[in-house]
Amino acid sequence: MSIILGIDPGSRVTGYGVIRQTGRHLEYLGSGAIRTQVEDLPTRLKRIYAGVTEIITQFQPNMFAIEQVFMAKNADSALKLGQARGTAIVAAVNNDLPVFEYAARLVKQTVVGIGSADKVQVQEMVTRILKLSDKPQADAADALAIAITHAHSIQHSLHIANSVKMTETQEKMTALLKTRYSRGRFRLKI
């Protein structure tokens, strides 16, 4: 069982979403947004850090997933986003959480099936995947989508690991059978 905290970073609004993954089953635990007022950047970063720390304390996640920085046209906006993202990561690391990063395009591809999906499509699919009665706010939906992407990544990794183990087992069994057959210890019955 994993409890995954997904974060959609922003210097004014940072979305969060928390899900529990048990095998292939995903359960919604909570979501929302950390909103900062029109204040100086250091104060906003302090609020983001405190907010993420509070969410970690409340939900006790054991994994932290966050959106990677994308290239923005406005350098100032990109720097502020990077600082907000870094602040959230520090809150996770200070609480001993492993940090996983996902590109926005991969998140949309995983949740919607289209890497160029818009926010409305992401909201709709998050609502369906988690069987929610109401659509979450856009920032919260993006954060939940990041958490879902991480859950999918875990499931995919387990599948690959099991496939590798199965392949190794099959190879060992084949080698054993070939050895026994070549030494006459094993006879094929047709």
UniProtKB/Swiss-Prot annotation:
Mg(2+) 2 binds at residue 67. One of its GO terms (molecular function) is DNA binding. Its EC number is 3.1.21.10. The gene is ruvC. Belongs to the RuvC family. This is Crossover junction endodeoxyribonuclease RuvC. It comes from Haemophilus influenzae (strain 86-028NP). It is found in: Cytoplasm. It holds the Pfam family RuvC. The lineage of its organism: Bacteria, Pseudomonadati, Pseudomonadota, Gammaproteobacteria, Pasteurellales. GO terms for cellular component: cytoplasm; Holliday junction resolvase complex. InterPro entries: RNaseH-like_sf, RNaseH_sf, X-over_junc_endoDNase_Mg_BS, X-over_junc_endoDNase_RuvC. It is an enzyme of class 3 (hydrolase). SUPFAM superfamilies: Ribonuclease H-like (SSF53098). One of its GO terms (biological process) is DNA repair. Keywords: Cytoplasm, DNA damage, DNA recombination, DNA repair, DNA-binding, Endonuclease, Hydrolase, Magnesium, Metal-binding, Nuclease.
